[in-house]
C-alpha cells in the first residue's frame, strides 16, 4: 500500500488584498482534462507540511507564503483496490506576497487564477470529491466538528470506480 502525504494551501488574500475567494491552479491530467485545486502537492521526505507547502506554492504560483494560520481541515482518501492511501492537510496562508508566475517544474500546473467564491466553486467542481467538498465547505464557512473528511474509492479502474464519503 502506497501512502502519500499532501499539503493544500488555502490562499484567500495576496499582498494583503482580500480576494473573497481563493487562488486556484489548473492541473493538466494524463487524460488531458483540467482539474482546478488549491495549490499544493506531495510533501517530500524530510519536509514538514508547511515547508513542503511553501515550496509547492512557490513552484506552482510564484507566490511566497510568509505566514500561516492553523490547520483548517484534513482529508483521508483510501483506495484499497488501487493500492494507495492519501492524507491531506489544508492550511490557510495569512501572508502571501509576490506576482503570479506559472513555473511548475512538474509541468502539471497550466494556469493560476485569483477567483471569487462563486467562480471558485464552479472551477472546483472539476476536481475529485475529496478536493471540492472540503474546499467548498471552507469557502462557505461550514466548520465540521472534527475538522476532518474521509473518503474511500471503490474499484480499480478510474473510469468505473466510485467515491464514497465515510465521514
For each feature predicted by the language model, list its residue ranges.
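Short active-site-proximal "capping" loops at secondary-structure junctions
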Residues: 30-31, 73-77
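Conserved N-terminal beta-strand and adjoining loop/helix that marks the start
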Residues: 1-23, 42-45, 73
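Conserved Nudix-box catalytic region and its N-terminal flanking loop in Nudix hydrolases
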Residues: 19-59
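Nudix hydrolase/Nudix homology domain
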Residues: 33-34, 106-167
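Unchanged
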Residues: 43-67, 76-130, 166-167
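Short, well-ordered strand-loop elements centered on a beta-strand within folded domains, enriched
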Residues: 18-27, 99-103, 160-165
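A generic structural motif
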Residues: 12-14, 26-28, 78
Amino acid at each position: 500500500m502506497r501512502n502519500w502525504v499532501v499539503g493544500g494551501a488555502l490562499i484567500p488574500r495576496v499582498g494583503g488584498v482580500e480576494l473573497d475567494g481563493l487562488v486556484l491552479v489548473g492541473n493538466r491530467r494524463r487524460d488531458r482534462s483540467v482539474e482546478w485545486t488549491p495549490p499544493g502537492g506531495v510533501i517530500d521526505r524530510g519536509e514538514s507540511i508547511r515547508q513542503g507547502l511553501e515550496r509547492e506554492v512557490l513552484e506552482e504560483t510564484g507566490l511566497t507564503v510568509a505566514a500561516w494560520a492553523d490547520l483548517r481541515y484534513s482529508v483521508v482518501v483510501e483506495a484499497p483496490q488501487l493500492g494507495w492511501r492519501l492524507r491531506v492537510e489544508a492550511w490557510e496562508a495569512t501572508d502571501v506576497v509576490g506576482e503570479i508566475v506559472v513555473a511548475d517544474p512538474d509541468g502539471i500546473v497550466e494556469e493560476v487564477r485569483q477567483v471569487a467564491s462563486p467562480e471558485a466553486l464552479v472551477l472546483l467542481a472539476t476536481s475529485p470529491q475529496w478536493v471540492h467538498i472540503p474546499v467548498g465547505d471552507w469557502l462557505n464557512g461550514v466548520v465540521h466538528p472534527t475538522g476532518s473528511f474521509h473518503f474511500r474509492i471503490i474499484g480499480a479502474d478510474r473510469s468505473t470506480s466510485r467515491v464514497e464519503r465515510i465521514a
